[in-house]
Amino acid sequence: MSDNEEDYDIARSLTVNLEDSDSDSGSDFSDEEQEVQDIISSEDEAEEQPKKKQKTAKPAKEAFPSLELSGDEDEQDDDKDMASYFAANNPQAKKAKAGSFQSFGLSKLVLTNIAKKGYRQPTPIQRKTIPLIMANRDVVGMARTGSGKTAAFTLPVIEKLKGHSARVGIRAIILSPSRELALQTYKQVKEFSKGSDLRAIVLTGGDSLEDQFSSMVSNPDIVIATPGRFLHLQVEMQLDLKTVEYIVFDEADHLFEQGFAEQLNELLAVLPPQRQSLLFSATLPRSLVDFAKAGLSNPVLVRLDADSKISDQLQMAFFTTKKNEREANLLYVLQEVIKMPLGTAEQIKKLRLMDKRVNDEAEEEELENESGSKRKYKFKKERLPSANVLPSPHSTIVFVPTKHHVEYITTLLRDAGYLVSYIYGTLDQHARKNQLYQFRLGMTTVLVVTDVAARGIDIPVLANVVNYTLPGSSKIFIHRVGRTARAGNKGWAYSIVNEKELPYLLDLELFLGKKILLTAMQEQKCQLLKDKQGDNYVEPKVQYTDRLVLGSCPRLSLETFEELYENLLRNHYELSVIKEVAAKGEKLYYRTRKAASTESVKRAKEIMDTGTWDDQHLLFGPNLEKEKEKFLAKLANRHVKETVFEFNKKGNDRDEDSLVSFMHRRRKQLAPIQRRASERRDLLQREREAGLTHGIEDEILKAHGETGYSASGINDVDEEELQNAFEDADQLSSKSNKKNYRDDRFFISHYAPASVIQDQQLNITSSFANEAASATFDLDNDDKIGNGKQVMQWDRKKGKYINSQSTDKKFIIGESGAKIPATYRSGKFDEWKKKRNMQPAKVGSLETEGESKQRFKHKRNAAPKLPDKYRDDYHKQKKKVEKAVESGRDVKGYHKPGQRSEIKSTEDIRKARLLKEKKMAKNARPSRKRK
């Protein structure tokens, strides 16, 4: 490895960018496939032609313009272009500073709420998308997790809706893939619309249908929902969505991967055609491009951070592990690397007390649902810290593959003394909120989750992310580590990798464009620099943001944590039982995991053959045990090696033994093969040091569009393909197309295009419509992998085999012609209406005067009880009684002095006479005694 490897890569990348720009300017455009349409560009043309006039927009049906942000140095020019472009639509923007919230033409109410949230300047995605949404354009927004996509669509929607409409009907729908993300979006909508009379509700699975019926009848303006529950209510209540003005698909790629394709298609069929559609996602597979063309009208594509898939402030470290040492590595990372403090007795006691209170509240809620009464007292919760404050200095998320691993790792860490919360897909909603609340409050420092937490859980700032296992997809890895290093903050991502996961790490290397750095490579580079520079040598720093640094934890320290883990496993029977269950779930998980690429598997074998892939990690400094390891390596590589057949055989015994002679002949046969393999390894090592190695990963450094370290960005659709799909009207009118020597219709490269590998990694499923429901990236089914393998089962009642996977469910035909389970229209809403004797207003009609968004919880105005002199609250209760009497209520048994009249009423006199007659009749009986 040469000492100027880093500079060489930079020079190559610059050359690639120059070649890209030349090829882009001379690329061919097909008039038969696409139509000309406007584009808003954020390139350096603003500096060269500052007085260039804006061109009018030209409509197109199948393409949408591209809006990119190339870097921070171009943001000021982009802001000027955007401000001038939308000056006609936003008169207030002329006086405001370009690129600020005021320049978007937002109302004073919205700007005040933005200031209360602490936001001063919009993020790049907000700066680009908000003016477009305000201009009534359909937008496809694309930026990484944590870049402010939620506020990018909530602010303009609130601004355009302004206030509550007296006409009945939903005006805006926001669809989210998970309950957590829906609740997070609802929270932001309420905060940004504070002070207005806009009505917003949230509809998620797991909540009461009757409460959601009440919310829908209250005529909301904005509905934030998960697709499954919203479609359920739409079919059950037979909702008319003709008043919908805005539809937002948040985390759109995840909506399809999670199996919501049928629900989305059904909802699109009932939406009005004149709606404004917004689609936001962290990634944009080619399938979503097709969906955007079909479901959106003349959309604009906004792409940010096209050259970086993860935050440039994120530092990553990858720790190698042996087969049974993954738990010990996790304990070592938490204790020695992150410096995670153990929980004190007071903290553990406080945490248990809160769990007990929450359980009591859950039981009370169940009793309320059964009896209909309201509880008298609710425990007061502490206020959460602000969005830009860490819950704790060591707050860490640990990602595990399945639900069983969540239970196993949670039990292990709690036994080790850590304060742990946990979340998985099928966890009860009440328990999920409590666990997240404890972590947000800082009462727990570790949150163990499955991939369901990679999106949607509202944790604004996080210190560390730990991958207990490396995910099988580079896309999942991006969304995992996207939880930290947000909003300009630094963060660490630690991953534990075994030899079976090494090919996936090499896939990640190609996907991110960041090379793997081994300890031996760094030491060799330092030695070359030391020999070259002499006394002026300064050891280069390891860039954990630019390289994937791979190595192992210190062996001596790791053995200590291995002993700790063995002791915990021995002393806790429950932990050993959960471990067995997690091991079975892990087998099913690996069985359904997507296979790594063939090239990465080959490279992984080459790296493991070198024997240096599990050297001590550079994060822990020099290895003090290296001399000992070198000595052991010499013993392992000794020339005279004896097998068990030859051991302790000497002299004539050695010559006469048939097994000894057999091993001698075997060595002669293998000697040429071993010699050739050794020569090949030495040759590869010398070529690698001299920089002569030429593989697929090196081809990309000099040719555009080949496999290897690509700089095409987070989307799997490369730049050349996007330019062919979505034409640029300015380039067509101002530049003449140059002819290319190759015809794309017939040219076949001898290397696979870079888009093929990235398409495989971004598109977790091969088919958009048919295979979305059975996607391997199914975050909610983290405990159901591999279920339902047996198809035919014996039915004792029917006396024959039946299909166990078939059900007797009945279906109804939806608006789009697709079949929907008949349970969606079960008649519960009709029963609810009949019980309350009400009829919902017709969509489009005006609200009646009695309608209100408020729900009256208390209708009775009962008088207080009489005060008891022997109770502590006697005086307090006495004041309540006196106040009730003054207000005109009758308190039974209480009579104020002078309040009662001495004159009896006719009714009292009549009752007294009857009572007297009864007494006389009773007392006037003849005596039973004898006279």
Curated annotation (Swiss-Prot):
Q: Which GO terms describe its biological process?
A: assembly of large subunit precursor of preribosome; maturation of 5.8S rRNA from tricistronic rRNA transcript (SSU-rRNA, 5.8S rRNA, LSU-rRNA); maturation of LSU-rRNA from tricistronic rRNA transcript (SSU-rRNA, 5.8S rRNA, LSU-rRNA)
| Basic and acidic residues composition bias: residue spans | 866-875, 882-910
Compartments, record wording: Nucleus, Nucleolus
Keyword entries, A-Z: ATP-binding, Helicase, Hydrolase, Nucleotide-binding, Nucleus, Ribosome biogenesis, RNA-binding, rRNA processing
Q: What's the EC number here?
A: 3.6.4.13
User: What PROSITE patterns does UniProt report for this protein, alphabetically?
Assistant: HELICASE_ATP_BIND_1, HELICASE_CTER, Q_MOTIF
Q: What is this protein called?
A: ATP-dependent RNA helicase DBP10
